[in-house]
Amino acid sequence: MLKFTQSYQFIQNNREGTALLAILALFALLGVIDRNYFNLQTFTMIFSSAQILILLAIGATMVMLTRNIDVSVGSITGLCAVTVGMALNAGFGLALSCLFALLVGMGAGFFNGILVTWLRIPAIVATLGTLGLYRGLMLLLTGGKWIEGLPADLKSLSTPILFSISPIGWLIMLLIVAMALLLGKTAFGRSFYATGDNLQGARQLGIRTDSIRIFAFSMNGVMAALAGIVFASQIGFIPNQTGSGLEMKAIAACVLGGISLLGGTGTIIGAILGAYLLTQIDSVLVLLRLPAWWNDFIAGLVLLGVLVFDGRLRCAVERNIRQQKYARFTTRPVAPDKKVKSNNNKAPSSKSFTKKEVVR
């Protein structure tokens, strides 16, 4: 049992390494099936396909670290994609149109944070409501129609330049490094972990937990806006169901990478690797020529499997730790020694009486 506990604790403390090993193992497996699969071009192609999910995983990580969850990111992604598309078709420049989308995403995330922190609405309930709100607003703006005829400037953002990586791909890599340093190396970043691990304790330490949570939701909205811009630049048009179902994949990517649903545990790198692994699984389905509707099924199955596996092992480890902790307080009953005879049950001899007792 001790070896089992140590093995699980090693896996739990090295979820990034576990996800990386899974990615490499999948590459090796597919390399055996198709030798052309194992090359740098395949790696960059999967990274390009994973950019939207990576951005959503970064935002979801910040929210989940504070022990919250946001299921409206798919709708925010669609709303921001519509915003940038409508602004471009209205004659605004690319930079200004992207700024509009980022402000819309930040505003949507900020509103989610207000609902959770100030109005004390549970995050899952609040964001379920805004999921429908933002989706409905998106359809109202477009009239249920697709946005087409986007300028070439937007599409150039996803055109490969250096090492087969697009400008927005390089921007995402810089963003990954910056967010990893922010959360892992700064006092402000550690405030997210403290807020999710022990809310009352963080408040007693002087951390402004409400501001931290609002900031997390706002940054989640910004990441969703960037994902919407990437989506529009990659395919060149905006369908009326843009972003639908992305929230589940974002949460699954974070859980695969070691982000705890209970808050306070995980890293950005782990979430990125989880997003890459999910996208790699999608590419495997394409290679195996399976229908596209298998993607959501596989993503849901992987998420459910990880949650069940993680929960069962966590309970087993906690039970074993409790047994070891309280084992030293358990005293074993001492068996009576049959060879030692007690003198308490012997009848008093005549020699034991005093003179006074004899006189009486």
Curated annotation (Swiss-Prot):
Biological function: Part of the ABC transporter complex LsrABCD involved in autoinducer 2 (AI-2) import. Probably responsible for the translocation of the substrate across the membrane.
PANTHER family: ABC TRANSPORTER PERMEASE PROTEIN YPHD-RELATED-RELATED, AUTOINDUCER 2 IMPORT SYSTEM PERMEASE PROTEIN LSRC
One Pfam family in the UniProt entry: BPD_transp_2
Annotated region described as Disordered, given as residue ranges: 334-360
Assembly and oligomerization: The complex is composed of two ATP-binding proteins (LsrA), two transmembrane proteins (LsrC and LsrD) and a solute-binding protein (LsrB).
Compartment list: Cell inner membrane
Keywords on record: Cell inner membrane, Cell membrane, Membrane, Transmembrane, Transmembrane helix, Transport
Name of the protein: Autoinducer 2 import system permease protein LsrC
Bias kind Low complexity: ranges: 342-352
Example of a GO cellular component annotation carried by this entry: plasma membrane
Species in which this protein is naturally found: Yersinia enterocolitica serotype O:8 / biotype 1B (strain NCTC 13174 / 8081)
NCBIfam families: PRK15432.1
